[in-house]
Swiss-Prot record:
GO BP terms: regulation of DNA-templated transcription
Lineage: Eukaryota, Amoebozoa, Evosea, Eumycetozoa, Dictyostelia
Domain of life the protein comes from: Eukaryota
Skewed-composition ranges (Low complexity): 83-99
Name of the featured protein: Putative uncharacterized protein DDB_G0274333
Assigned GO CC terms: DRM complex
Segments for region (Disordered): 81-108
Length: 108
């Protein structure tokens, strides 16, 4: 799986590299020649890359947390946390607060 991930990252870097070199116009012209179906496939490929990178980032952050390098995800990347992740974190916090603290509380 690492090889596949590395290949995807390499492909993404190769795709984005020309944009850094001010060749946006060339890339735009290349993409403008694509058919509607090719554009859909290309967009899907970019979405797959974004997902793969997001998963890889989450794995690295989790590893950092487990090793004690990163104490809290929000401390590291609070501005880039997407809305869905913020909602999920809030829901998890609410659920934890609602859970009983001990085994005897349910019997009272």
């Amino acid at each position: 799986m690492s090889d596949t991930h590395d290949d995807r990252v390499k492909q993404l870097v190769e795709f984005l590299d020309p944009l850094v070199d001010d060749s946006f116009k060339i890339k735009f012209n290349e993409l403008s020649k694509y058919s509607k179906e090719e554009l859909k496939q290309h967009t899907q490929k970019l979405e797959d890359w974004a997902l793969a990178l997001g998963v890889a980032e989450q794995k690295q952050l989790q590893t950092g947390r487990l090793l004690g390098i990163i104490s809290d995800f929000n401390e590291f990347n609070c501005e880039n946390t997407n809305h869905h992740q913020q909602q999920q974190n809030h829901q998890n916090q609410q659920q934890q607060q609602q859970q009983p603290n001990g085994i005897f509380e349910n019997n009272i």
